A protein has these predicted regions:
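Alpha-helical membrane-embedding segments
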Residues: 38-42, 82-97, 236-253
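Long, solvent-exposed extracytoplasmic domains/loops
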Residues: 50-167
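Membrane-interface extramembranous regions at the lipid-water interface
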Residues: 2-27, 162, 166-167, 203-212, ...
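Internal alpha-helical transmembrane segments
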Residues: 1-56, 225, 230-232
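Alpha-helical transmembrane segments forming the membrane-embedded cores
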Residues: 203-264
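Alpha-helical propensity feature that highlights long, continuous alpha-helices across diverse contexts
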Residues: 123, 171-178, 182, 239-247, ...
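Membrane-water interface at transmembrane helix exits
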Residues: 40, 192, 196-204, 228-232
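Selective detector of the "anchor" transmembrane alpha-helix that sits immediately C-terminal
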Residues: 172-202
Length: 264
């Protein structure tokens, strides 16, 4: 493809390249999707103990109570407690300890659930779920000993526990994110291209095929996806909001450019 670099900034070039080979458009689409997904992935990777504690305010005292009152060992990524299932309330959170699979629970608005395989923290504003992968081989007593040895306060230790729980899902979170973004924009590009065809059916002298509209809409993604990925490394939340707005603006500009050039 000649003048590839020009599609990064030139809408005219995107229109000119609408007949490019299909496999090149597929490659551009896949790379763009990976770039668009970067903010979602980096948001997970950049989660800090402090940010997690801000999300789940007031959970720390109840977590320390769980470590203090229950004799539990994590072996082969499974929680093994000497005590039977029990529940207690600390602050705004209700805690469920040693929950077995299939056990029925009456869950409140805010809760922390330690099952044998998974930890879940839930509030109306968000939730966190993960397993014991990064805590494997430790016990509640050892975590308390670490707190004393390192002179950690309740918030700091709890923040690191939440981070370990969150990061345990990276192996599934990252591929799921890429697949989700791929499906989302596969449908989105197809729908936008169909709308382009419907609007332009009787307005353009030169007929533009569905494939050509798809190609133009894919080429329009690349530079914006690159910008999104760069911003996402520093500000994931802003990056995820910016791309759809920029992309739709560019698609509209290409549409009017195409309409103007086709009528001349």
């Amino acid at each position: 493809m000649n003048n590839f670099h020009r599609i990064l900034y030139s809408n005219d070039e995107i229109i000119k390249q609408r007949n490019t080979k299909w496999y090149f458009a597929v490659i551009i689409f896949i790379v763009s999707v990976m770039l668009i997904a970067t903010p979602f992935v980096s948001a997970k990777l950049l989660e800090s103990p402090k940010s997690l504690m801000n999300q789940f305010k007031g959970v720390e005292n109840g977590m320390i109570q769980a470590l203090t009152d229950y004799d539990c060992q994590i072996t082969n990524k499974t929680l093994d407690c000497q005590q039977e299932f029990s529940t207690y309330t600390n602050g705004d959170y209700q805690f469920f300890i040693n929950v077995t699979e299939g056990q029925e629970l009456d869950l409140p608005d805010k809760y922390v659930l330690f099952s044998q395989e998974v930890v879940t923290i839930f509030t109306r504003d968000g939730h966190l779920q993960g397993d014991y992968t990064l805590l494997d081989g430790t016990s509640f007593n050892e975590l308390l000993e670490l707190k004393e040895e390192e002179n950690l306060d309740n918030q700091t230790l709890t923040g690191h526990l939440l981070q370990n729980i969150s990061q345990s899902t990276l192996g599934t979170h990252i591929p799921q994110t890429y697949i989700s973004v791929f499906i989302q924009y596969f449908i989105y590009v197809g729908l936008v291209s169909l709308v382009n065809m419907a609007i332009n059916a009787n307005r353009l002298k030169e007929k533009i095929s569905f494939k050509q509209f798809v190609t133009m809409n894919i080429l329009a993604m690349f530079s914006l996806a690159l910008i999104t990925a760069i911003i996402g490394l520093f500000s994931p939340v802003n990056a995820t909001a910016i791309f759809p707005l920029l992309y739709m603006a560019r698609v509209i500009m290409i549409y009017f450019k195409l309409l103007k050039s086709n009528q001349n």
